[in-house]
């Protein structure tokens, strides 16, 4: 929760999540809210968090006004039609770890670790100032701020993908999205493209195509990286020999996902 708006993600049974959506839509303020729904076999979150923050996603530029200057929405079907037009530039506003495993074909990417790093790359983006900008992110939240930032810095024609990558995959089959979509829950990556799917990321150990993220089994390292299943067992889920020899290395169970100590999922 922040002054600029709300953003939330929940996980539950079909009945539970439907009751949640019905309850929100019963409030006139949320009657037209669009929910992005993914079906999964397991609960995606281990614990509930409600936070009040200065920004929904930290950007660090105080004067950006998402209510006045956010880019125009492009519905997924429209995006598919115009993304390859001349003088059009597709820009990915996600972190490097996200676009490493999946991105739109020919998209401009930024070497950022956090969304708040975007303003540092304004100089690089200036070369596209007179182009038609098509911005995208996972679900559309970050693009509200990123497109407003571009417009406030003189970019004239700025659009962003309504509903983000996830909605694009549902409504268009995900055509021309290479790889998988990174998500910030226990799933880590999800399939998007059922039309012309590819794998663009590679195992850090052997170099074979893989989109399988794990955390290093050495708790002190905990590096988040791509490791194929075979190399996972060979390296015991570690990113280096030093981590594999570490006395406090966690037992690798084939998933590379380790719950925080003292945390228990409640279903």
Task: Label each region the model flagged.
Residues 90-92:
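Structural scaffold elements adjacent to functional motifs in cytosolic proteins
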Residues 69-85:
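Internal catalytic-core helix/loop-beta-alpha segment
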